[in-house]
From Swiss-Prot:
Catalyzes the reduction of 2,3-diketo-L-gulonate in the presence of NADH, to form 3-keto-L-gulonate. Homodimer. This is 2,3-diketo-L-gulonate reductase. Belongs to the LDH2/MDH2 oxidoreductase family. DlgD subfamily. Its EC number is 1.1.1.130. It comes from Escherichia coli (strain K12). The active site is at H44 (proton donor). One of its GO terms (molecular function) is 3-dehydro-L-gulonate 2-dehydrogenase activity. The gene is dlgD. SUPFAM superfamilies: L-sulfolactate dehydrogenase-like. NAD(+) binds at I168, T169, M170, V171, D172, M173, S174, W224, K225, G304, H305, E306.
Amino acid sequence: MKVTFEQLKAAFNRVLISRGVDSETADACAEMFARTTESGVYSHGVNRFPRFIQQLENGDIIPDAQPKRITSLGAIEQWDAQRSIGNLTAKKMMDRAIELAADHGIGLVALRNANHWMRGGSYGWQAAEKGYIGICWTNSIAVMPPWGAKECRIGTNPLIVAIPSTPITMVDMSMSMFSYGMLEVNRLAGRQLPVDGGFDDEGNLTKEPGVIEKNRRILPMGYWKGSGMSIVLDMIATLLSDGASVAEVTQDNSDEYGISQIFIAIEVDKLIDGPTRDAKLQRIMDYVTSAERADENQAIRLPGHEFTTLLAENRRNGITVDDSVWAKIQAL
């Protein structure tokens, strides 16, 4: 089905208000969920909203909490999210990293005691729109087996890198071949995954999203490489924030909350002039996209460039929402 941005935001806002969230906070949170969905990231927008409300009702998310600065070391700051709303706090933390970068050339904010930030790409994009390189990542509860294991012991720990090119170039990727959100998107659409995304119950690689969702044997990106990246990203976030690791979140908490996140902004213009920056970025993009195609019907893509097109299509034609997901939200 199709809905408008206004319908989507109003539905989110209604549910938040009914759960006791104050009107200003509810409006800002609903706006971010709706913008994420409008951008085409359904897995971490509308599809994720019922799970967000479940955690709100369970007390994992404290809607009136505000992040608090703990330590300041010039270009580096350490903050405590105090289990506040994840997407609103993440936006504030990237804004703070940008402020630090304006003064120092680079800004790094390490956040502990945080909640799920929904679409991580929003915060990299936020920096790139202002002319900064944006880098951020988060740890999570253990939802992926390390390479060679059957049991979940590491997080998908998504990493975002956004570049202020025209259009913005951005990688937003979990350390698994697919996020659990994308497994859900493909399952709801009745599709197999385009490539292997995990193991079935017999230990064979599979493209069946429902099987992987059930047995939790999701495949690390690049096999042992994604497994290793997940571990070191968790270590860095834990150390810089003095926060909880994947092991602590999984073993000590009843659900995924109290996680650790990193936000980095770099002011490119302190290092290179604008025309030179733009020319160098354009040459990279032209060189990549001018390669001979393996399939004449399949364009060579640059990461993140599709979001401009998706946003325009959704604004023109309405936002696609799965019927079952919309029914869940209406019932909340």
